[in-house]
Amino acid sequence: EFTFGEMQMIVRSVATPGHTPGSTSLEVDGKYLMTGDAVFVTGIGRPDLGGETEPWARDLFHTIHDRLAPLDHDLLVCPAHYTSRTEASEDGALHRQLGDLLENDPIVSMGDEEEFVKYVVDHLGTPPDQYGDIRKVNLGIIEPDDEMLKELEVGRNECALTA
């Protein structure tokens, strides 16, 4: 539980491995699910960027079905990135109800693990060009300047796999 001035919020961590082994989502006040790159408004985070595509795809399948599916389906999934502004709601917000994502997203709703893994492996394409730089920044190996940060963060989301 956190207090900011007069505002209090309850934050609960949910391990959501798949995009990366340490991926963690945050449930905030029982209303929002900050998913980082685990799942997006449409699609999932790529499980291949660490070179362990099939095992991480299996982790992601179990994240969806064993960790996210039991949560309140009214939670609003708020990912770290978006692929297109068309994913925004009428008020411009980039979120989607968890239940809608689980039931209607063509990838997230796949109920068979082998089908899911095969689909993911067969549809990934090449990793994003900037991934090497992103990894070096995340590990503290390089210190990005403002221009590099803008390029890495503002560019289109290439860490997602959508149907």
Q: Where are the predicted features?
A:
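Catalytic core of the metallo-beta-lactamase
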Residues: 1-79, 85, 162-163
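Accessory terminal helices/loops
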Residues: 62-163
